[in-house]
Swiss-Prot record:
Homodimer. It is an enzyme of class 3 (hydrolase). Disulfide bonds join C213-C221. The keyword Signal applies. A beta-D-glucoside binds at Q44, H148, N193, E194, Y337, E408. Belongs to the glycosyl hydrolase 1 family. GO terms for molecular function: beta-glucosidase activity. This is Cyanogenic beta-glucosidase. Residues 1-11 form the signal peptide. Keywords: Disulfide bond, Glycoprotein, Glycosidase, Hydrolase, Signal. The active site is at E194 (proton donor), E408 (nucleophile). It comes from Trifolium repens. PROSITE patterns: GLYCOSYL_HYDROL_F1_1 (PS00572), GLYCOSYL_HYDROL_F1_2 (PS00653). The gene is LI. InterPro entries: Glyco_hydro_1, Glyco_hydro_1_N_CS, Glycoside_hydrolase_SF.
């Protein structure tokens, strides 16, 4: 977790750092108030998946039912066992001299049935009270994400989770429970983490829970429609965010003195050439990833390119929904990992609709034999450090210069290595 306000981005100039000597790189190189932190999510870290009254999430179901969809066939039953070992983890963070810990609350741990009417799990509430108190006692601030992909299985069973309009009200009620229980100590709230990731991976490719996509794609999904469901899931995530943010701002913000935002992820897209068709393709790449959410959050509507290309498959906001969405965040959490070349892709006549092809771009890591950058350990992660600066400037110039927290970034490696390979990133 890194904090930065884009007002000052224009003044940034890369330092001529020698990677053989990092002795001059320290906190004094950063502006006062810059926040250094680390981040996690409930399903990936907590474990205790079926302990102390917690209900199952769609990820519990997905990893147990389809272990072949997980690279090493693992699940979140134990994870790193933070549920039982959070004091050790926070002690390590303190030793690292961190300022903040960003973690998510497991919706089904506090509401096992997903709804207030299904009962509140006090043991879950107690766990997060203890976690928050431990973070504060060790001199750090909690940055709390309300939703990091773990929809309660009960809501998936009842109305297919984020494909159902009812989730907007249920998420608002869940958020209010968290504001009531933890808002006296939590001053930074994040409603959703990477709604693009949920929409695409869970409903277009079927690689995330609940594993939906069009049958004709032959991706071994549980059913779905890759041309419609990703847009619907994104739409309801946006409305859920707006409902929770509005509630916080009108009912809790004045007394609790906190702020609320949303975390989005985006690649950077470099035009494959100087041709207008490729320049436009790069812009569409940003529209279909970042603008898909930032346009509604700042302008109350989807990007023009999406409205033109997706047409009737793209849901519409009512006048009231548009009003609630516009400006519904105090800060933007931004996650950046990778960049792509973007070139124009031809429209295929009579093609079956799928979000994967709607943007009419061909995104690659190499163009005409020239790689954009070296690859990290993940097949989707191209190491292109300048992409984060370009992305920050793009957000500043196109979306009203919001306050930004860099809530995730970095690269992975298939081997244990020294810090030197990460410094350029």
């Amino acid at each position: 977790l890194l904090s930065i306000t884009t007002t000052h981005i224009h003044a940034f100039k890369p330092l001529p750092i020698s990677f053989d000597d990092f002795s001059d790189l320290n906190r004094s190189c950063f502006a006062p108030g810059f926040v250094f932190g680390t981040a996690s999510s409930a399903f990936q870290y907590e474990g205790a998946a079926f302990e102390d009254g917690k209900g199952p999430s769609i990820w519990d179901t997905f990893t147990h039912k389809y272990p072949e969809k997980i690279k090493d066939r693992t699940n979140g039953d134990v994870a790193i066992d933070e549920y039982h070992r959070y004091k050790e983890d926070i002690g390590i963070m303190k030793d690292m001299n961190l300022d903040a810990y960003r973690f998510s609350i497991s919706w089904p741990r506090v509401l096992p049935k997903g709804k207030l009417s299904g009962g509140v799990n006090r043991e879950g509430i107690n766990y997060y009270n203890n976690l928050i108190n431990e973070v504060l006692a060790n001199g750090m601030q909690p940055y709390v994400t309300l939703f990091h992909w773990d929809v309660p299985q009960a809501l998936e069973d009842e109305y297919r989770g984020f494909l159902g309009r009812n989730i907007v009200d249920d998420f608002r009620d869940y958020a209010e429970l968290c504001f009531k229980e933890f808002g006296d100590r939590v001053k930074h709230w994040i409603t959703l983490n990477e709604p693009w990731g949920v929409s695409m991976n869970a409903y277009a490719y079927g690689t995330f829970a609940p594993g939906r996509c069009s049958d004709w794609l032959k991706l071994n999904c549980t059913g779905g429609d890759s041309g419609r469901e990703p847009y619907l899931a994104a739409h309801y995530q946006l409305l859920a965010h707006a409902a929770a943010a509005r509630l916080y701002k009108t009912k809790y913000q004045a007394s609790q003195n906190g702020i609320i935002g949303i975390t989005l992820v985006s690649h950077w897209f470099e035009p494959a050439s100087k041709e207008k068709a490729d320049v436009d393709a790069a812009k569409r790449g940003l529209d279909f990833m970042l603008g898909w959410f930032m346009h509604p959050l700042t302008k109350g509507r989807y990007p023009e390119s999406m409205r033109y290309l997706v047409r009737k498959r793209l849901p519409k906001f009512s006048t009231e929904e548009s009003k609630e969405l516009t400006g519904s965040f105090d800060f933007l959490g931004l996650n950046y990992y990778s960049s792509y070349y973007a070139a124009k892709a031809p429209r295929i006549p009579n093609a079956r609709p799928a979000i994967q092809t709607d943007s009419l771009i061909n995104a690659t890591f190499e163009h005409n034999g020239k790689p954009l950058g070296p690859m990290a350990a993940s097949s989707w992660l191209c190491i292109y450090p300048q992409g984060i600066r370009k992305l920050l400037l793009y957000v500043k110039n196109h979306y009203n210069n919001p306050v930004i927290y860099i809530t995730e970034n970095g690269r992975n490696s298939s081997t244990i290595n020294t810090v030197t390979s990460r410094i350029p990133f």
